[in-house]
């Protein structure tokens, strides 16, 4: 803590005045003399990087308080930052002084809560206020008079404020594309602060539509992880888009306060033409969050014009926290130009482990909202399966918190429907993807007995697996 003091009078061999404690050191400090006929008064003005904070103890005399207010207004008007005023004004809410104060200042504390005398408060003479000229960059989260009757002859006031983040600090990640099926595309990204978000998109950058996520009639907002679906897109058409995030400083039943708005640069994408007979895709697996390996692989494909990317498991392995997951997902999506190229994230056995494993799905928009599924890319049908863990559910290391037997059985039903579907039958080519191969493992594959009879007769052209760390 940093201590600042503005002496007003000599007292008992020392000084008496205004004190200020702050977590950060002020960039500028000033003591301003104020009138007081019974005793001299003072104002301490501390300038910080983003705001000004002033403390004072005004005179008992109305005339002196009015003169002090004029001095305060003059100093406040010289700053462009938010300016806050706190202290003992020696005036009740109905007084002429407070009425004059409120013409230029917005009171942030609750005048209905008495502050004096501390043992049994009957009057409100202490306030926290903000200069109206520059009071747009924050919101009052809470205000209270603390139940402390002993520390001082006045009760302390606590006002919690939330200040607006700068626009260039609002985005935490770049946008990344997900779930490019059904003539649609999902755009995802994260912000550093709770925000109200939308996507602006169109076939050029001058005629833009707006998309938001609306659930049961309400816009999804005041969150940090954002997922917005763009529907009714035309295959083969190039689209431009940018993501927009406006900070939400306050979200209450009858009041919302917004901060600054950040807008990303424009990115572009194109959905595949129905029936196209060729495409390029990149499949990664078992990266195990090895950044150097991933970047080296990206250098090998930097000159390839690929259409989509699949991360076939054990890439965002053992996710311990939201921060850890976000960091490596950003590494992956930015490495493959995920703002322009859609990515599919499939689970391996390691995505299922650790404290944030369940939360990991919030970062993706799975096809059909399942960790398994199927889709068409041109004339090709692509089927993705989720093998779950590589050990039985009753293994001690899972602590009875897994039931992948149910998930594997569920996919038996999915496979039966998929193999009989016209989309699968009419496809010219068929690709199967799953993390753990059905054969060639050191141990027993828990999917083999369930899936083999269905898959061995299915006309897949290629099956791509991972897990074994062997080529």
Spans of features found by a protein language model:
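His/acidic metal-ligating clusters that form di-metal
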Residues: 45-54, 65-100, 195-197, 208, ...
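Acidic, histidine-bearing metal-coordination/catalytic regions of metal-dependent phosphoesterases
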Residues: 2-3, 27, 134, 153-155, ...
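Structured beta-strand-rich core segments of catalytic domains in phosphoester-bond hydrolases
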Residues: 1-51, 142-146, 220, 376
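Extended active-site neighborhood of metal-dependent phosphoesterases/phosphodiesterases
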Residues: 15-20, 27-30, 244-268, 323-420, ...
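Active-site beta-strand/loop signature of hydrolases that rely on acidic residues for catalysis
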Residues: 1, 21, 53-56, 71-98, ...
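Active-site environment of divalent metal-dependent phosphoester hydrolases
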Residues: 11-13, 40, 61-64, 89-96, ...
């Amino acid at each position: 803590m940093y201590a600042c003091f503005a002496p007003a009078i000599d007292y008992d061999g020392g000084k008496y005045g205004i004190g200020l404690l702050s977590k950060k050191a002020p960039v500028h400090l000033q003591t301003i003399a104020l009138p007081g006929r019974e005793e001299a008064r003072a104002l301490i003005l501390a300038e910080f990087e983003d705001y000004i904070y002033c403390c004072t103890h005004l005179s008992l005399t109305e005339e002196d308080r009015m003169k002090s207010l004029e001095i305060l207004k003059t100093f406040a008007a010289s700053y462009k930052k938010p300016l806050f005023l706190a202290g003992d004004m020696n005036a009740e809410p109905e007084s002429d002084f407070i009425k004059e104060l409120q013409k230029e200042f917005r009171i942030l504390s609750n005048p209905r809560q008495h502050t004096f005398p501390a043992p049994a408060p009957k009057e409100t003479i202490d306030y926290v206020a903000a200069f109206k000229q520059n009071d747009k960059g924050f919101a009052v989260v809470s205000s209270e008079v603390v139940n402390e009757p002993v520390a001082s002859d006045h009760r302390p006031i606590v006002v919690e404020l939330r200040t607006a983040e700068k626009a260039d600090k609002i985005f935490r990640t770049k946008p990344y594309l997900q779930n490019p099926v059904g003539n649609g595309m999902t755009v995802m990204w994260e912000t550093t602060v709770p925000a109200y978000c939308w996507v602006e998109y169109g076939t050029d950058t001058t005629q833009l539509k707006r998309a938001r996520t609306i659930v049961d009639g309400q816009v999804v907002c005041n969150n940090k992880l954002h997922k917005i679906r763009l529907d009714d897109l035309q295959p083969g058409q190039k689209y431009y888009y940018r993501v927009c995030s406006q900070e939400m400083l306050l979200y209450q039943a009858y009041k919302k306060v917004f901060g600054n708005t950040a807008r990303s640069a424009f990115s572009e994408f194109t959905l595949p033409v129905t029936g196209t007979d060729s495409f390029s895709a990149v499949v990664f697996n078992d990266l195990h969050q090895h950044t150097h390996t991933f970047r080296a692989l990206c250098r090998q494909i930097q000159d390839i014009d690929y259409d989509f990317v699949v991360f076939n498991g054990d890439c965002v392995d053992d996710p311990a926290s939201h921060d850890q997951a976000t960091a490596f997902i950003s590494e992956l999506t930015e490495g493959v130009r995920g703002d322009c190229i859609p990515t599919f994230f499939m689970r391996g056995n390691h995505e299922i482990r650790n404290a944030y494993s369940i939360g990991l799905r919030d970062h993706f928009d799975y096809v059909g909202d399942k960790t398994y599924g199927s889709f068409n890319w041109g004339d090709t049908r692509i089927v993705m399966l989720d093998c779950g863990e590589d050990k039985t559910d009753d293994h001690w290391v899972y602590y009875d918190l897994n039931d992948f037997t149910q998930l594997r059985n569920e996919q038996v039903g999915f496979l039966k429907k998929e193999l009989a579907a016209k989309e699968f039958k009419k496809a010219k080519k068929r690709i199967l993807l799953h993390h753990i191969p059905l054969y060639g493992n050191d141990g027993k594959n828990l999917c083999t007995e369930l899936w083999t009879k269905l898959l061995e007769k299915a006309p897949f052209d290629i099956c791509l697996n991972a897990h074994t760390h062997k080529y």
